[in-house]
Amino acid sequence: MRKLFLDAFGEKKLDKPPVWIMRQAGRYLPEYRAVRAKFDNFMDMCRNADACCEVALHPLQRYDLDAAIVFSDILTIPEAMGMDLKFIKGTGPVFSEPIQSQKDLDKLKSIEDSIGSLDYVYNAVKTTSSAINVPLIGFTGSPWTLAAYMIEGSGSKQFNKLRKMMYANPQLMHSLLQRLADITIIYLLEQVKAGASSVMIFDTWGGILPLEHYKNFSLKYMEYIAKNVKQKINIPIVFFTKGGSNFFEEIKDKSCDGVGVDWSVTLKQARHRIGVGKVLQGNFDPAFLYGSKQSIRETVRANIEFIQSDKLNNYIVNLGHGIYPDIDPDSVRVMIDAIREFSA
């Protein structure tokens, strides 16, 4: 197995950084769209281990990447807890009966029953890990991010229902977050048992919170998960809070091994605020792939020059969030080739 990705979490400074891409198995690839067309709905595809493996392999077959990520969705846990999940074209994920009260919370399945409904994810991990020669990344949504969808019923611009519960009924909010955290620990451990070499916690909506509430309602539960997972098996764990650059000083002392960085700050700024010891992952603006070949190469060169100038810390080159569906696959090749060229 090529271990450059895992080596980034070691103490030795690497000669070149590993690279992978958030949502690297996705709609920007025509081969992905061909597989997706075979299924009536997205979750049916996620439940098919062979399909998950096939689409996870697509980017590895096209590009020189150092890691794969299991093909799944962050909302598998809420669905396993008994919530009715549908993916609606033009809207995205929708829960028909959002969590609004303690009564709604009481309707959810137990942790044991919920975990038993997620075997299809572990099967996808096992099938994919046996088919690749690079590390496989397992993942989950943070409890706060899962709760955001469970309470709102869908994505939102302002998350008023979510934030209302946080302020008006914090006890209920913490009850939901704790249950999600307890399930997530088992969920990640099962992914590791099935073949994941590291795990990532996507805190997509943590960035909407004020600092103190981020600490109490998001970071607290990510840290709880990381500590409990590491008590069982010491694997690399990456925290990624989208829009979370204001929280780096809080994250730097937590149990994660790496921190995802979006494009709102430079890697130099992120390193200054996080300090030494954590791997930084990121942080290209996904939209930079709309640019010309020359502009892509220039942007890559600047980041690689900084990475190589830091003699103490390792970096994982990635986008600052998921790749956009309408990105030209050839632009991704330009990016990766430039990363390899300027890292040589």
From Swiss-Prot:
It is found in: Cytoplasm. Belongs to the uroporphyrinogen decarboxylase family. It is an enzyme of class 4 (lyase). Its main location: cytoplasm. Homodimer. One of its GO terms (biological process) is protoporphyrinogen IX biosynthetic process. This is Uroporphyrinogen decarboxylase. Signal peptide: none annotated. One of its GO terms (molecular function) is uroporphyrinogen decarboxylase activity. GO terms for cellular component: cytosol. Pfam families: URO-D (PF01208). Keywords: Cytoplasm, Decarboxylase, Lyase, Porphyrin biosynthesis. It comes from the Bacteria. Substrate binds at residues 23-27, 73, 149, 204, 321.
